């Protein structure tokens, strides 16, 4: 009788539903950034990156993003800039080949979902908050993410490049992920 009571109690307690795990569709996804150089805007993208995404808009506490970026895969369309960014003044890929972002939580600001997490870049860990737009699509979904980081917080752009009148202090991060359920 006692076993039956324990079983009934266990069944009566609602289980916390896990977020849906998604697989990134790389060919239809982008991870990019924009900044300014001498007042002119420029855009860039990373060609190699991975993302483990678990998301449930109704239960944000069960959601998680884990993104790793191969920094040497950066492309901006400008040869001089593309040659400089992996170097020691900027990403220093010889010492720090990857950047890593992992969420620590999610919250809502009105209708906007915000992913809070830690970004590790050049060996420096800083909190970063990103706006999230998740749209179910058929069996999968799209996930758009946007936010701003201060490059000097991570030591990106040293020496003459630390001057924010040459290279702007703020770098906008943007990503569009096409996701399929696992």
Residue positions per predicted region:
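Bacterial N-terminal signal peptides
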Residues: 5-15
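Low-complexity, acidic/polar, glycine-enriched regions of mature
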Residues: 18-182
């Amino acid at each position: 009788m006692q076993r039956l009571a324990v079983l009934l109690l266990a069944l009566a307690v609602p289980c916390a539903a896990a977020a849906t795990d998604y697989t990134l569709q790389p060919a239809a996804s982008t991870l990019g950034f924009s900044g300014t150089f001498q007042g002119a805007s420029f855009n860039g993208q990373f060609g190699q990156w991975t993302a483990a995404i678990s998301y449930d808009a109704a239960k944000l506490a069960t959601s998680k993003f884990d993104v790793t970026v191969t920094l040497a895969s950066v492309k901006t369309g400008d040869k001089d800039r593309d040659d400089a960014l992996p170097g020691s003044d900027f990403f220093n890929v010889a010492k720090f080949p990857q950047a890593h972002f992992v969420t620590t939580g999610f919250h809502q600001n009105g209708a906007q979902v915000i992913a809070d997490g830690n970004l590790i870049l050049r060996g420096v860990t800083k909190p970063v908050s990103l706006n999230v737009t998740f749209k179910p699509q058929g069996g999968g979904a799209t996930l758009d993410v946007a936010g701003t980081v201060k490059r000097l917080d991570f030591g990106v752009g040293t020496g003459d490049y630390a001057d924010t009148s040459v290279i702007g202090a703020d770098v906008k991060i943007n990503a569009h992920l096409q996701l399929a359920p696992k």
